[in-house]
Amino acid sequence: MALFSKKDKYIRITPNNSLKSSVSRNVPEVPDELFAKCPACKHMIYQKDLGPAKICPTCSYNFRISAQERLTLTVDEGSFQELFTDIETKDPLRFPDYQAKLQKARQATGLHEAVLTGTALVKGQRLALAIMDSHFIMASMGTVVGEKITRLFELAISERLPVVIFTASGGARMQEGIMSLMQMAKVSAAIKKHSNAGLFYLTILTDPTTGGVTASFAMEGDMIIAEPQSLVGFAGRRVIETTVRENLPDDFQKAEFLKEHGFVDAIVKRTDLRDRIAHLVAFHGGVS
């Protein structure tokens, strides 16, 4: 018989659940909205350092902002009068879960649809204004978006106003099928009438502007300006590369690439847009 028993290789520890719960309660929690990660430089940024314009202090990347934030940055305080808020989609295809998706987007954004339309003053210059919000079903263009923008141009013709549109969209709204594609032609016809009346139309391309919006009113302005590094295109990069069987340049479909090739007139910093809009509208016979 051995004098000494063999020792275990490991020390058994019984977990103390009460200690674990006590420690977890004392760990501070950081609110999700306190910091933002820049998609460009990958730096973590304290939200307050972004400022109201939501521009990365490290690399100057322009974060996507809501229509309401854009409105605050652009127009004279208290001058905006919203129009055409009573237009509703007829949901022509009875697309599954479409109404639920619309309701969710309305609750998340505070908007009734993907575009905010109305009249406003920008440094004293009166104009008709539309701002698309990519947070609302990616600002896809359905019948309501098309109708609101068409009516805005009709109002601008009757009141002799310039039109300014901030574009941001993933394209036509698939839940409305061919009816969404019809909006491209309808809005373009209204733009033509506005142009024939000798009135000024300015488009401002923001990230992202793609699909049917790019193929219609986004690229039909008398002047086309864009925010830095905005994604602007029709089809997606992978679709194009697969179709043409070639690798595209790294900066393909960026605003700077489009300016270099003559599709955009100017790249303007977000913080300078208000001054630039007022200057261009006044230069083209604006209304004050």
Curated annotation (Swiss-Prot):
Its UniProt entry gives the catalysed reaction(s) as:
N(6)-carboxybiotinyl-L-lysyl-[protein] + acetyl-CoA = N(6)-biotinyl-L-lysyl-[protein] + malonyl-CoA
Question: Where do the zinc-finger regions (C4-type) map?
Answer: 38-59
The pathway to which it is assigned is: Lipid metabolism; malonyl-CoA biosynthesis; malonyl-CoA from acetyl-CoA: step 1/1
Please provide, in alphabetical order, the Gene Ontology terms of the cellular component aspect for this entry: acetyl-CoA carboxylase complex
- Give the cofactor binding note: Binds 1 zinc ion per subunit.
What cofactor is this protein dependent on?
A: Zn(2+)
Q: Give yes or no: UniProt keyword Translocase.
A: no
Q: What class of enzyme is it?
A: transferase
Q: Name one Pfam family in it.
A: Carboxyl_trans
Q: Where is the CoA carboxyltransferase N-terminal domain?
A: 34-288
Any idea where this protein resides? Cytoplasm
What InterPro entries does its record include? AcCoA_carboxyl_beta, Acetyl_CoA_COase_Trfase_b_su, ClpP/crotonase-like_dom_sf, COA_CT_N
Q: Which UniProt keywords apply?
A: ATP-binding, Cytoplasm, Fatty acid biosynthesis, Fatty acid metabolism, Lipid biosynthesis, Lipid metabolism, Metal-binding, Nucleotide-binding, Transferase, Zinc, Zinc-finger
Q: Which GO terms describe its molecular function?
A: acetyl-CoA carboxylase activity; ATP binding; carboxyl- or carbamoyltransferase activity; zinc ion binding
What PANTHER family does the database record attribute to this sequence? ACETYL-COENZYME A CARBOXYLASE CARBOXYL TRANSFERASE SUBUNIT BETA, CHLOROPLASTIC (PTHR42995:SF5)
Q: Please give the subunit comment from the record.
A: Acetyl-CoA carboxylase is a heterohexamer composed of biotin carboxyl carrier protein (AccB), biotin carboxylase (AccC) and two subunits each of ACCase subunit alpha (AccA) and ACCase subunit beta (AccD).
Q: What protein name is recorded for this chain?
A: Acetyl-coenzyme A carboxylase carboxyl transferase subunit beta
